[in-house]
Amino acid sequence: MIPTYMNIMLAFTISLLGMLTYRSHLVASLLCLEGMTMSLFIMTALIASNTHSPLINIMPIILLVFAACEAAVGLALLISISNTYGLDYIHNLNLLQC
């Protein structure tokens, strides 16, 4: 396997392990989730550059749009939780339900 792909897969795996390890704090979970989406973006961009199909060239852009949306929703949740409770624990997300 090409070392570039191995490094990107390693970055995704480390972000996934970080997500599983630091799942109590929202900031750490959001950072790990952002690392996972960035490694997926780089992987799809590399695959799109290697295959010269016009249909796959749009996939990195679509993934980047979804990453921006999840970052915006995550930051909105972080702000609402930290303003309400003063902490960024994920178990406070259950308290936001009506």
From Swiss-Prot:
The chain crosses the membrane at residues 1-21, 27-47, 61-81. GO terms for molecular function: NADH dehydrogenase (ubiquinone) activity. It holds the Pfam family Oxidored_q2. The keyword Cell membrane does not apply. It is found in: Mitochondrion inner membrane. It comes from the Eukaryota. It is an enzyme of class 7 (translocase). Its EC number is 7.1.1.2. One of its GO terms (cellular component) is mitochondrial inner membrane. It is a multi-pass membrane protein. Keywords: Electron transport, Membrane, Mitochondrion, Mitochondrion inner membrane, NAD, Respiratory chain, Translocase, Transmembrane, Transmembrane helix, Transport, Ubiquinone. Core subunit of respiratory chain NADH dehydrogenase (Complex I) which is composed of 45 different subunits. Belongs to the complex I subunit 4L family. Core subunit of the mitochondrial membrane respiratory chain NADH dehydrogenase (Complex I) which catalyzes electron transfer from NADH through the respiratory chain, using ubiquinone as an electron acceptor. Part of the enzyme membrane arm which is embedded in the lipid bilayer and involved in proton translocation. PANTHER family: NADH-UBIQUINONE OXIDOREDUCTASE CHAIN 4L, NADH-UBIQUINONE OXIDOREDUCTASE SUBUNIT ND4L. This is NADH-ubiquinone oxidoreductase chain 4L. The gene is MT-ND4L.
